[in-house]
Amino acid sequence: MPVNNFGFLATLLFVAVPMLFLIGLYIQTNSNKS
């Protein structure tokens, strides 16, 4: 199943944005605890 550039970019953003958000929260909570 070939994936066009728009579909690939949309999937990448759909996965990357929440992951960056969760990583940011994780780092924030860790820095607050220490």
Swiss-Prot record:
It is found in: Cellular thylakoid membrane. It is a single-pass membrane protein. Its main location: membrane. One of its GO terms (biological process) is photosynthesis, light reaction. It comes from the Bacteria. Keywords: Membrane, Photosynthesis, Photosystem II, Reaction center, Thylakoid, Transmembrane, Transmembrane helix. The chain crosses the membrane at residues 7-27. Pfam families: PsbM. GO terms for cellular component: photosystem II; plasma membrane-derived thylakoid membrane. Belongs to the PsbM family. PSII is composed of 1 copy each of membrane proteins PsbA, PsbB, PsbC, PsbD, PsbE, PsbF, PsbH, PsbI, PsbJ, PsbK, PsbL, PsbM, PsbT, PsbX, PsbY, Psb30/Ycf12, peripheral proteins PsbO, CyanoQ (PsbQ), PsbU, PsbV and a large number of cofactors. It forms dimeric complexes. One of the components of the core complex of photosystem II (PSII). PSII is a light-driven water:plastoquinone oxidoreductase that uses light energy to abstract electrons from H(2)O, generating O(2) and a proton gradient subsequently used for ATP formation. It consists of a core antenna complex that captures photons, and an electron transfer chain that converts photonic excitation into a charge separation. This subunit is found at the monomer-monomer interface. This is Photosystem II reaction center protein M. It comes from Prochlorococcus marinus (strain MIT 9313).
